[in-house]
Amino acid sequence: FDMRPEDRWWCTADPGWVTGTSYGIVAPLLAGVTSLVDREEFDAPRWYQLLAEERISVWYTAPTAIRMLMKAGAELARAHEYPALRFVASVGEPLNPEAVWWGKDVLGLPIHDNWWQTETGGIMIANTPAFDVKPGSMGRPLPGIDAFIVAHEEADGEPPRVRVIDAP
């Protein structure tokens, strides 16, 4: 997320979920940044107002929320300006390419996807600020992470086997 001391961070995940706890509360505290915790339900006009008025610089949200904002219309987003916003990321499910381009068009920034799960304890694969975003891709393994594709194969007359694909 390239958090900086002057950042204003907003993770829209509920603190009752691991993303909300890990990245909504613990991560900004460890990074020493100001964090917005919003207890209200999703409301597109209010979310845009919060992004603008709270001068959010790094925003972490879910693809479902992004698609709901898309459905609410670009004109609603364009009713505000977001001069502080410098990085937008999503997590929780695959981010469709249209959402990445919507972010670039409406917010002026592409949306960076990433992947992790409760069992990993943190982000494993990401489109970091250092990478150009390829819509439809969640990014690359972070330093120190080896990621593989595991394929279950069955051939006629042979027992099933698992194949690990570690190179393109």
Model-predicted segments: where are they?
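Thr-Gly-centered strand-to-loop micro-motif
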Residues: 11-13, 37-38, 89-91, 113, ...
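Generic structural signal for helix capping and beta-alpha/helix-loop junctions
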Residues: 19, 45, 68, 97, ...
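Membrane-embedded alpha-helices of multi-pass transport/permease systems
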Residues: 22, 63-66
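Alpha-helix N-cap/helix-start capping motif
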Residues: 15, 41, 63-64, 93, ...
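Gly/Ser/Thr-rich phosphate-binding loop
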Residues: 5-6, 30-33, 56-61, 70-133, ...
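Conserved AMP-binding/adenylation subdomain of ANL enzymes
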Residues: 1-11, 15-58, 71-72
